[in-house]
Structure formats: structure tokens, C-alpha cells
Regions:
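Structured secondary-structure scaffolds
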Residues: 1-205, 227-270, 290-300
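Polar/charged alpha-helical tracts
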Residues: 26-34, 47, 325, 348, ...
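Acidic, turn-prone loop/beta-hairpin segments
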Residues: 63, 207-236, 267-363, 370-371, ...
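A short, hydrophobic C-terminal helix/tail in secreted or cell-surface proteins
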Residues: 381-385
Length: 386
């Protein structure tokens, strides 16, 4: 090999003895500091070894630099030393090492062995290993099969956030499949997140500022208190998932919350208050206070996944929802107005409320199917309102 980090040993041209000692090593260190490791292959040993250019066995002065190099896994395996320890803006151990599953016996292992051998501990706090990308049928992608998915083309057609959302939704610790059908399903999930953000903004932008219009938790309407309790529980799940690098779990918690609990239940139940109650009334401000909390939560939780979408939403957000920041990446993690323990105290009421809603909804559906359900709506505006 004519590249790589050389093993700094020499061979005596006169007797074949291998030569490597403190004097030669000091000379090589000085050479590398001045010219870099490539000088090993370009400079004659006698030009930098000086008096140490001598064979201890036969006394000859004709030393030839050996061409062997260190294993490339040794090179990368000491990056914690060459990079993390020497650069003041970095930390050692590193927060996380991220690589493919083929590095279990490569970089991950060589880094672990060298760091433990030198310092007695791992060079990383966590390891995140990813599998390989296969087509929808689980086959390796190849041009001959015509099953290659070009991420640049997907970005052009669907947007980068679709790829980011797909990556977050699958278990990348093992091999994952992708094709146009899978991306279409991902695109549908993306629209659900985006539409939820749009709805929240439609009830907040230019109408509500949490810092001046917000309602304290103790004064919220009962339904709104239940939603704050629920979002607090979901946030705890998302925090734990992100801390464990379990991105699919974070995605699933957010997706289920948005689709099942927000769109299908809570946001639907708020529409009477949001559309009919007087602006500035407690009933409406109570609802908007929770919408602002939901928006603040989703901005922060979705930022690692839907970076571009969240930045787009930031442009229309009330300043108090986004800490007066311009970019979502600068936001701190979401903090609920109540603790998880306080939220858990509402668990029984929340379950009973959902069971009651389910029973009422079923009764209404049965009555509608039987043709016995009638709904009459009367409006009677006062002269002042008219």
C-alpha cells in the first residue's frame, strides 16, 4: 500500500535486521510534525534520522523505510484521540457514534478497543447502528434490477421532509425497505402533520398571543385540562424516545397522538368554541391556550424530523409559541405547564371521558343507521349581534 499511516520501522539493507527504537521514533515524530506522514514515502531515511540512521546489529548505515501501514481500522479507531481530544469544541467521550451495521466489527470495535486500552472506558456514550436500504421486496438495490430509489429525485418530487419522515418512521437498526408505494404512505402521514399545524395556526395567527392572552392551567376548562395532561404524557414518551435514539418510537407517539387524539377527538370537539364563541371569552381563550401549547410542543418535537416544514410554520407562529426565535433548531425542548405526575392524576378522568365519548358516538351512529336520528339547529341572534 502506498498510502495510509506507516508503521515506522526500517530494514537494514546490509543484514536484513528490523530497526525501530526510541531514537528513530523521535526522528519520525519530528518529520511528521514538519511534513506530514506522506514524508515517510518520499524522504530518504538518512535525510531525517541523522545519527540514529544505524543498524544496531551490524553497524550499517543503509536503512530502508518499510512500506507496511497500520490497519485502516486502527486509523479510524483512534479518531477519538486525533479528533475529539485535540479539538476544544468537541467532547470525549463523544455523545454518539453513528455508522452502518457492517461497522460492528470495524470502526465501533477498533474505537472501543483502543479507547479502553488507553483510558479504560469507551470513546462514546452511545452507539447507533443502521442497516442497509432495500427495495420494497427486500432486494438489494441495483441498476440491473431497475429498483434504485434516487433520494435526490425524491427530494425534487416530494420534498426532503418526506425522506426525513420515512427515515424516522422505520427501524434503521436493521435493513429497511423503500419503494414508491412506501413513500406514498409516508407522504400521507406527512400531510396529516402538516394539516394539523395549519389548523393550529389558523386559530392562533393574528388572534392569540400566549404571553398576553393565555389562561393559567388552573383556570382552563375541564376538557382543555385533560388535553394538557395528555400532551404532557405524550411529551414524556417522545423525550424518552429521542434520548434513547429510538426515532421510530418518537414518530409513532407523535403520529398516533396527532391522528387519533387531536384530529379525531379534541380538535373536532373545540370547533364550536373556536367558531362560535366570542373572541376574548374565557371559553375561546382556554381552547386557544391549549392550541398554543400543542403548537409549541409539535414545533419542537417535529423539528429533528420535519425541519423544513417546521421552519415554514415558524414564520406564521405567535412569538410566544416559539420563544421569539426565527428558526426551530434554536428552540429549547418543550416543557409542559404541569409535571408528568400531575398529568397522571387525570388518567382516570381521561379514560372515563373517552369511554363515554365512544359510547355516545356508537349510539349516534346506530341511530343514524336506523334512521331515527334527527338533529335540529336553531339560531336566534340578539338585535345587537344582528
Amino acid at each position: 500500500r502506498n498510502w495510509g499511516v506507516p508503521i515506522p520501522s526500517y530494514t537494514c539493507a546490509d543484514c536484513g535486521e528490523k530497526v525501530m527504537n526510541d531514537a528513530t521514533l523521535d526522528a519520525v515524530i519530528k518529520l511528521f510534525h514538519e511534513k506530514g506522514s506522506d514524508a515517510w514515502f518520499t524522504d530518504a531515511p538518512e535525510s531525517y534520522l541523522g545519527e540514529s540512521c544505524v543498524c544496531p546489529k551490524c553497524g550499517g548505515h543503509h536503512l530502508k523505510a518499510d512500506k507496511d501501514i497500520l490497519d485502516v481500522w486502527w486509523d479510524s479507531g483512534v479518531s477519538w484521540k486525533a479528533v475529539c481530544e485535540y479539538r476544544p469544541e468537541l467532547e470525549y467521550p463523544a455523545d454518539v457514534y453513528l455508522e452502518g451495521s457492517d461497522q460492528h466489527r470495524g470502526w465501533f470495535q477498533s474505537s472501543l478497543l483502543t479507547s479502553v486500552g488507553a483510558n479504560g472506558h469507551a470513546p462514546y456514550k452511545a452507539v447507533v447502528s443502521q442497516g442497509f436500504t432495500l427495495d420494497g421486496q427486500g432486494r438489494k438495490m441495483s441498476k440491473s434490477l431497475g429498483n434504485v430509489i434516487d433520494p435526490n429525485k425524491v427530494c425534487d418530487e416530494m420534498g426532503a421532509d418526506i425522506i426525513r419522515l420515512w427515515v424516522a418512521s422505520v427501524d434503521t437498526s436493521s435493513d429497511v425497505s423503500i419503494d414508491h408505494e412506501i413513500l406514498a404512505r409516508t407522504s400521507d402521514a406527512y400531510r396529516r402533520f402538516r394539516n394539523t399545524l395549519r389548523f393550529l395556526l389558523s386559530e392562533l395567527e393574528g388572534q392569540f398571543e400566549p404571553e398576553t392572552d393565555g389562561v393559567a392551567f388552573v383556570d382552563l376548562l375541564p376538557l382543555d385540562k385533560l388535553m394538557v395532561a395528555r400532551l404532557t404524557q405524550v411529551q414524556a414518551e417522545v423525550d424518552d424516545a429521542y434520548a434513547s435514539y429510538e426515532f421510530p418510537r418518537a414518530y409513532r407517539a407523535l403520529y398516533d397522538f396527532v391522528v387519533t387524539e387531536l384530529s379525531n377527538v379534541y380538535l373536532d370537539a373545540l370547533k364550536d368554541r373556536l367558531y362560535c364563541d366570542k373572541p376574548g371569552s374565557l371559553e375561546r381563550r382556554s381552547a386557544q391556550t391549549v392550541l398554543a401549547e400543542l403548537f409549541s410542543m409539535l414545533m419542537r418535537d417535529l423539528q429533528p424530523i420535519l425541519s423544513y416544514t417546521v421552519d415554514e410554520a415558524m414564520a406564521y407562529a405567535p412569538a410566544g409559541c416559539v420563544d421569539h426565535q426565527k428558526y426551530a433548531a434554536l428552540l429549547d425542548w418543550y416543557k409542559s405547564p404541569i409535571t408528568v405526575d400531575e398529568a397522571n392524576e387525570f388518567e382516570g378522568v381521561l379514560e372515563a371521558s373517552l369511554e363515554l365519548r365512544s359510547a355516545v358516538t356508537k349510539a349516534l351512529e346506530d341511530a343514524r343507521s336506523a334512521g331515527t336520528f334527527t338533529c335540529l339547529l336553531y339560531t336566534s341572534p340578539s338585535p345587537r349581534d344582528a
